[in-house]
Curated annotation (Swiss-Prot):
Subunit structure of this chain's protein: Interacts with bacterial lipopolysaccharide (LPS) and lipoteichoic acid (LTA). In vitro interacts with phospholipid bilayers.
GO biological process: chemotaxis; defense response to Gram-positive bacterium; innate immune response in mucosa
Signal sequence annotation: 1-27
Secreted is among the record's keywords: yes
TM helices/strands, residue ranges: none
CDD domains (UniProt xref): RNase_A_canonical
Protein name in UniProt: Eosinophil cationic protein
InterPro entries cross-referenced by the UniProt entry: RNaseA (IPR001427), RNaseA-like_dom_sf (IPR036816), RNaseA_AS (IPR023411), RNaseA_domain (IPR023412)
GO terms for cellular component: extracellular space
GO molecular function, one term: RNA nuclease activity
Principal subcellular localization: secreted
Glycan-bearing residues: N84, N92, N119
Organism this protein belongs to: Macaca nemestrina
Length: 160
């Protein structure tokens, strides 16, 4: 007879713990609103090469982010996408606060090419430029955000 090592309750706690660790890897630094963090991660009109552009994000998160997309547009243009018709978010089908861009924008997608990097100063990325539609999730602004925009982008859901 084999001893029972894990009860269903322990398995659930382990799973929730792993999800918490994964969620914390993608957590927004507390000094930023969701919209501010969105802008830092995804808005860059003239991004340099990925390895350089990703340093800011990696410095805040203290790790090498696996991938990221920079939209080569302004925050104001992305706010305007929030005025488009609401759709179900392609990546999170339970959310209905997504909006699809009306036109393709230039972008730079970055893929980590050395995932075993132990130090954020050694993160290296492959550059994949493109021109695509995108979908953002939008929410009412945080009181710390500029009152100029009542609804702001908070999440880049997908690139089409």
């Amino acid at each position: 007879m084999v001893p029972k090592l894990f009860t269903p309750q322990i398995c659930l706690l382990l799973l929730l713990g792993l999800m918490g660790v994964e969620g914390s890897l993608h957590a927004r630094p507390p000094q930023f609103t969701k919209a501010q963090w969105f802008a830092i991660q995804h808005i860059n009109v003239n991004p340099p090469r990925c390895t350089i552009a990703m340093r800011v994000i990696n410095n805040y998160q203290r790790r090498c982010k696996n991938q990221n997309t920079f939209l080569r547009t302004t925050f104001a243009n992305t706010v305007n996408v929030c005025r488009n018709r609401s759709i179900r978010c392609p990546r999170n089908r339970t959310l209905h606060n997504c909006h699809r861009s009306s036109y393709r924008v230039p972008l730079l997608h970055c893929d980590l090419i050395n995932p075993g990097a132990q130090n954020i100063s050694t993160c290296r990325y492959a550059d994949r430029p493109g021109r695509r539609f995108y979908v953002v999730a939008c929410e009412s602004r945080d009181p710390r955000d500029s009152p100029r925009y009542p609804v702001v982008p908070v999440h880049l859901d997908t690139i089409i």
